[in-house]
Amino acid sequence: MTLRDAEYWAKRFRQLEEAEHDKSSQYIYENVEKQFTLAIKELEKEITAWIQRFAEDNALSMAEARKRLTTKELQEFKWTVEDYIKHGEENHISGEWTKQLRNASDRVHVTRLDSLKIQMQQHLEALYGNQVDMLDKHLQETYADSYYHTAYEVAKGQEVAVQMNRLDNARLASVVSKPWVRDGKTFSDRLWRDKDTLNTVLQEQLSQAVIRGEPLGNITKNVRDRMGVAISSAARLVSTESAFFATAAQQKCFSFLGVKEYEFVATLDDRTSEICQDMDGKHFKLTDMKPGTNAPPMHCNCRSCIAPYFDDAKDSARAARNLETSKTETVPADMTYPEWKQKYVEKASTGPK
């Protein structure tokens, strides 16, 4: 067994963090920026159609906006709402929103402005419902990838392998559903809260724009600007939650492997925060690990990570036996991650929760 120095471990685990960071960046581009951009286009289309239908000279007065829908318009509106309800039931959108839609469908009188607000909120409910589902899947994948890649890097570094327990779907779902911030809110709670805030702001802006008689261009620009803020907020959430669960997976893996201490490893460049610069190179007991205090994420968009810390050869030699054969197994220098996973994970049983 080779005894690696701290620089080796820091380099390897910094590379792991960079790989996870790249995955999160790609996720943000594919599932946040693109999805929000599509939602912006849909909102602009709804607003444009509404203005063109009821306005004169490309602007609508509050008096006109507060007029009730005609019998024909009301029927069309109810058909639209029924479609929303069906979509919500098929895609597990908030039950509270479905209840509001049913109430709207039963109303005898609906104003023009209310009809647009309901259409706008429907797009937000669908958007954020998808965000919750996609982020849940992403965080589960992040946790599993970090857990297995951590075990692989330790095995390669020590040149010995341990048979790993497989992480089943139920365990992964349970892990990412638990709150880790002091306020007790999960990523799902934060997304739905952000949706409520965004919906309130957009509807207030719409009402104020109508009161002022603003033209269509101003209204749609306000929507784009506010949605841009929402994109940034969602991206920060993805980045921070991903960093936490990647680190949590490493902590769990270190504990399983018998690693007693870890080193704080910062990505040192001109974007590194002062707090991460100060923490870089410090090592702590694994049992004392607290994200935000002595482990990543220390802040939003944190790019720091942890690496195993071995004080001597005795520490480095811990937990290097195959769980099935109780024998130490050597990891070939050229063993790839897929080969390692096939041998030491895929053939293993599902471990205890």
Residue ranges and their predicted role:
Residues 1-142, 225-226, 232, 236-353:
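Activation/maturation switch segments at domain boundaries
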Residues 101-224:
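Structured, charged N-terminal subsegments at the starts of enzyme catalytic cores
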